[in-house]
């Protein structure tokens, strides 16, 4: 109690508890809720005031109006919304560019003033969000080793440091001999250095007791016991130093099992070269020198891959790069996302140096090349680019490579032997017939034989040392053509036409067959989804229509083959008038379509897909 003249100020210590209890009661009874959060299809009705008082993210979003964030892509480089109101009279899709509509009914939904009250939180798990909301309304959070990672992820995405702190405290208190490996993995994923050090103490204690054969087996194991190659090296040094007189004879053998090229050059100098036997032992000296030389030539690393430079994993993962979201602003995405098969969800891996859609990606020795595309939507190709970038998943880094000689979007790119090929497309001059070839070793572009006809929005695939190009648009007309390029002879040959004209489709190779899937064609002035799936036999030069059509129309999806299935991600459905955020999967062996759990961060048309091997610990939401 404090006095000032005839006034008295009295503090009620129970008021904050009573207020929180009252808010929790309103939440439990769903009274006066003014915003709905959706995560993994589950809805949570909440109060904006509560969210904004605890979360910097929501505070900024609600105070700024948040655009129209019907669906939020949360993570590095994510945008707050999908776009604003469409033009008063949206123009019809131009015939010469069939791939992406100028507007859709979904644009009107996104432009609704009420959209701010319904937020789809892509990248947040429903379990994690529920537990975080319980904390906001009760000051209590229920954690276990099975749920703490999801809670931690949501708290970091939504910028709620109090919950992050509680998660860290829980992990630090829970570390034991039985669970330190699991805790160490969680700590590595989320950059929790203190927790990682505590967990590693248990690991080191176990490792020091191993004999030589057990230590050697540990270094060869997949996945590795620690999150980085440097940590693996340091663990090996500790083992050797623990009984130096007896164990130092094993140093060369153990060092051969390490992949020094996976350690960044500065750390090789500061942390590896500083260890005495790495400078004095001839075998260790050579291993270090080879790694240094590897890092000196970044533009040729994709030509110098060996076991010493490959990620310690053998599991390929599905990647989605860029794409065009709905909305009249039509700014392409710069996100690179990957599908976590264990969690059944798409996660943000990194961001590109620029925004892009209608581009191509090509995997080369587990490096991802991103070529061309457009950084703004324009039906006449005014914003087509000639950019070429290479992504390195080992270090989460990008480098710029020599640009293509022509700007191009809606084209096809592939790898064949030691070359990349880019074929056709469109730019401000119109449709292209030109074909460029990039030598992966010399880092140079050159022209090779052009397509017989200018084409854009076509699909392509590589089979048996040759490149196949199907469909597309030629001078505004959809075509069923199939061309085959022989790189040895540098000639194009016309093959049997498809049964259906189509563009903005995909062409995938499996079991010596080419599958033409998705796309659309024109009937009068109307775009129609192509539902038929066609299969081509290169030996017999014959197309067959399969009995199982595609699940739903998909124009401009990302496409990749993984294991025994063909994956289509995103795209646009003309029959539904909607951009897609889901992933559908076709099994040629079973002849069936399925839909994967989990959506990408936002609906997209014109993204690109590939498969790469990622490190065991992917810090996807740092």
Curated annotation (Swiss-Prot):
Signal peptide: none annotated. Kelch repeats lie at residues 317-366, 367-418, 419-465, 467-512, 514-564, 566-614. Residues 73-108 are annotated as: Disordered. CDD domains: BACK_KLHL14, BTB_POZ_KLHL14_printor. GO terms for cellular component: cytosol; endoplasmic reticulum; endoplasmic reticulum membrane; neuron projection; neuronal cell body. It is found in: Cytoplasm, Cytosol; Endoplasmic reticulum membrane. Keywords: Cytoplasm, Endoplasmic reticulum, Kelch repeat, Membrane, Repeat. Residues 87-96 have a biased composition (Pro residues). Pfam families: BACK, BTB, Kelch_1, Kelch_KLHDC2_KLHL20_DRC7. Residues 33-145 form the BTB domain. PROSITE patterns: BTB (PS50097). InterPro entries: BACK, BTB-kelch_protein, BTB/POZ_dom, Kelch-typ_b-propeller, Kelch_1, KLHL14_BACK, KLHL14_BTB_POZ, SKP1/BTB/POZ_sf. Gene3D superfamilies: 1.25.40.420, Kelch-type beta propeller, Potassium Channel Kv1.1, Chain A. It comes from the Eukaryota. This is Kelch-like protein 14. The gene is KLHL14.
